[in-house]
Amino acid sequence: PARSIPACSRQPGPGLVPARLRQPHRASPTRPGCDNVPMTALFAGLTTLDVLHRLDHVPDPGLKVTSTDFTMAAGGPATNAAVTYAALVAAARPRSADEAEADSPAPSPSGEAPTLLTALGEGPVSAFLAADLASAGVRVLDATAPTPPDHPSAPGERGAAPASSLREPAVSSIIEHPSGRMVASTNARLDADPGRVAAELPERVGVVLIDGHNPALAQAALTLGVPEVDGEDPFALLEARPPHLRVLDGGSWKDWLTPLLGLVDVAVVSEDFAPPLLARADGEQVAGFLRGFGITRVVRTRGERPVQYWWDGTSGEVPVREVPDASTMGAGDAFHGAFAWALERAGDADPEGLIRFATAVAGVSVSSFGTRQWLASPALAELVRG
């Protein structure tokens, strides 16, 4: 059965949750020690180096072109969602007069900063990613697995690829132009060992979000806060529940997701999310498939078309506001981060309110080029404060 986890008893004030999401009559906490726990979240998944170029015309593949804009930042679904969450934390925090005069809100240095469980790898690219995420207000737990001494890529092995090249994070090169975009990516190639950083995981969080890029990281995040269970009982882990909701960012189907779906409370999927045997699945079929694993809350994004939802027996659509000259890179990730932020603070009783807020934040994200410029927009504070 679906669980309804009330918002934390530390009553969110006007500067924390938009008026349209506030639920002043919700019961005070059932989470143990909730009064003393900062509102925060755990994100788990892929981190890449995103190199983005913008063109003012459709490129000719035979010609060298000059970009009109360029940026470089840490990317990846869970990573961009964590950055969005951190930006909303900063926008919600009361600011001094000096901060108000600054160009953008400072990243949150408090316990509210989201934690990102990921694999950064080694080398200068990894160092850049760590610095970029720190400046964005994201706390990073790097679970990159060590290279075994007998691995073919270990130093001294003849004919092996340089170990350094296999220890570097994935790189995505994105060219955005008026008719769309082109992407070339090395994809995920780092092994992760979350046990290396298990002691640094937050004791309690308000929400957990995983993307579909690393089963070890997903397993560690989804079992955070779960009581110890009888290892001989195959259903014990499914029945043991943490005191927070767990969200799946389902951009596309991955076969390894199947044994973990029973640990998910809310699935936010894209139109490309097509489970086995549902090659051209519609929303009803996807929601029905996930319902078979006990997931009774499903949100399905479809680009500029209305967002669909199926929520504890109800269903509907929420329209998406059209943004002219939209730069859609990372828009879905911004939606997921904003959805997690609102779910953690406002609870789960109003799915349409959660979706409206998340689509509004995603709308801000597409109003400027890249995945970082929009974080300085005053529109974020306006959305947060309702």
Model-derived regions: residue spans:
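Short acidic active-site motifs
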Residues: 193-197, 217, 255-257, 285-286
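Short catalytic helix/loop segments, enriched in acidic residues and glycine
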Residues: 56-78
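Compositionally biased, low-complexity flexible segments
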Residues: 1-33
